[in-house]
């Protein structure tokens, strides 16, 4: 597993505003979109391309195009949906799938409640969007789900991670070539499995609390 923490002053600035408890939801959503676009630049560093011949207004020349099939972007519902716009700003021709997973707050078990993905992901580059890598349970289960569909080239884009979550991914995924791109690795998890200092519940802050 390869972990990349993006070191950039704009990333640090936007993340600081996200952390602030009084940042309202509309501003929070906009900042997530902007921050994810910055993370996506790094996450797509190894996106597959091929040479193409193009015609400029002056002459024919060689260019570069994304290969087919196009990359697949998979937000983990619901909070991952808030990251989708930022990712597709950078790769608008990507296909989008959806994976609904939630953590049971009582047992901390991961429940899969929805999925909309191709049956066969063999040969596809997949970008998983999940803002908070806390215990690592959700992301680990999502990656295993994608593996069962044939995916091998998986990059996870997250805003924050806890060391415990990264350790769990490393333990459960072994030597698999998963890439994780982050804005920050925070201090720890608290007794409720929230990231400290974190930014609170990303889904609630994106969309408001839904009981």
From Swiss-Prot:
Organism whose genome encodes this protein: Kocuria rhizophila (strain ATCC 9341 / DSM 348 / NBRC 103217 / DC2201)
Biological process, per Gene Ontology: UMP salvage; uracil salvage
HAMAP family recorded: Upp_B
Sequence positions that bind uracil: 195, 200-202
Recorded family membership: Belongs to the UPRTase family.
SUPFAM superfamilies reported in the protein's UniProt record: PRTase-like (SSF53271)
Catalytic activity: UMP + diphosphate = 5-phospho-alpha-D-ribose 1-diphosphate + uracil
Annotated function: Catalyzes the conversion of uracil and 5-phospho-alpha-D-ribose 1-diphosphate (PRPP) to UMP and diphosphate.
Alphabetically ordered keywords of this record: Allosteric enzyme, Glycosyltransferase, GTP-binding, Magnesium, Nucleotide-binding, Transferase
Pathway assignment: Pyrimidine metabolism; UMP biosynthesis via salvage pathway; UMP from uracil: step 1/1
Classification via InterPro entries: PRibTrfase_dom, PRTase-like, Upp_B, UPRTase/APRTase, Ura_phspho_trans
Keyword GTP-binding included in the entry's annotation: yes
Classification lineage: Bacteria, Bacillati, Actinomycetota, Actinomycetes, Micrococcales
Chain positions recorded as 5-phospho-alpha-D-ribose 1-diphosphate binding sites: 78, 103, 130-138, 201
GO molecular function: GTP binding; magnesium ion binding; uracil phosphoribosyltransferase activity
Protein name: Uracil phosphoribosyltransferase
